Design a protein with these regions (language model features):
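Short, motif-level signal for alpha-helix interfacial/capping segments enriched in acidic residues
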Residues: 14-23, 68, 200-211
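A generic structural signal for short coil/turn motifs at secondary-structure boundaries
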Residues: 44-47, 249
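Short, structured coil/loop segments at alpha-helix boundaries
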Residues: 12, 109-110, 266
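Long, contiguous juxta-domain segments that are non-catalytic but functionally important
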Residues: 1-28, 64
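Conserved beta-sheet core of the metallophosphoesterase superfamily
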Residues: 132, 158-177, 182-281
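Core catalytic region of metal-dependent phosphoesterases/phosphodiesterases
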Residues: 20-40, 48-171
Length: 281
């Protein structure tokens, strides 16, 4: 036990802190940029000739992330706050068994879980650094997905330790599966989408959100099904996002498109701008 504690202590002592990032000089105090990243499936292996889509592995996903993030950030305004929502299924697998934890569906993986987790943390660190260069403060939330019910926690805790000395970054460690944030008269929500239909999500939020009645502009993100859809449900604007990842062998049986985007919200008027990159190579 003492040897294990010693190894853990050495690992945390070697965890480098986030380096300082220059504060942007001119930001809009009434704006909040939201980057919803759903279904990244980091560590997935896909062969385009088999799937009818593009190839996918860790190296290609890294290039896609760097290129896509740069494109949407170039369009979005500099804002008081940015929110990076990792909306579940950040990693394709949860362990080295290469199966979905609940249904035991076999997964095509590109690497062992140690490398997948390490490289996933590194690319999210890159994303946080880029977002912080343009926005005054950044909030990070890592949500559970059906592919990563445990590994998402390791990534969240790693990001919290990395940003501990950075006052402009907050890692939201709320253990609930629902993300909720108020921005003036605007409310933003997120949930992976595998355990609740959109109508039920709207009813649930109206019941439990403490600032629901204060915000006439309400927006919710989900993912999971890898197919874009949007609907006005009661007082909620619900959107199921297109995935970051392309199709794998299983997903090739239906049509989906990839995308990465930033939504800009005004604290009084709700969503005012959307920047989308289709992640085409």
């Amino acid at each position: 036990a003492e040897e294990s504690l010693s190894r853990m202590r050495e690992a945390f002592e070697g965890l480098l802190e986030m380096p300082p990032v220059d504060t942007p000089s001119d930001v809009a105090a009434d704006l909040c940029n939201v980057i919803p990243l759903f279904d990244v499936h980091w560590g997935m292996a896909a062969w385009g000739e088999e799937t009818g889509d593009v190839d996918y592995n860790i190296e290609l996903a890294r290039d896609d992330m760097m290129r896509g993030l740069g494109r949407v950030l170039s369009v979005a305004p500099a804002a008081q706050r940015a929110v990076l929502i990792l909306g579940g299924d950040l990693t394709h697998a949860d362990d080295n068994n290469a199966q979905t934890p609940k249904s035991k569906h076999p997964l095509d993986v590109a690497a062992r879980m140690h490398r997948v987790t390490d490289s996933a943390i590194e690319i999210i660190k890159f994303a946080v650094h880029r977002v912080l260069e343009k926005n005054l403060e950044v909030v990070i939330r890592v949500l559970r997905g059906n592919h990563d019910p445990n590994s998402h926690r390791a990534i969240a805790f790693a990001l919290r330790e990395w940003t501990r000395s950075q006052p402009r970054v907050t890692v939201d460690m709320d253990p609930r599966e629902m993300f909720m944030m108020q921005w003036g008269r605007t409310a933003m929500f997120a949930q992976h989408g595998d355990r609740m239909k959109a109508v039920d999500l709207s009813l649930k939020l109206a019941d439990v959100c403490p600032f629901w009645s204060e915000c006439p502009h309400r927006y919710a993100y989900t993912g999971h099904l890898h197919r874009m859809s949007a609907e006005r449900i009661g007082g909620l604007n619900w959107e199921r996002l297109e995935p970051f990842a392309p199709s794998d062998d299983y997903g090739a049986t239906w049509v989906n498109r990839r995308a990465m985007k930033i939504d800009t919200y005004h604290n009084q008027r709700g969503r005012i701008l959307t920047a989308i990159d289709p992640l085409e190579r």
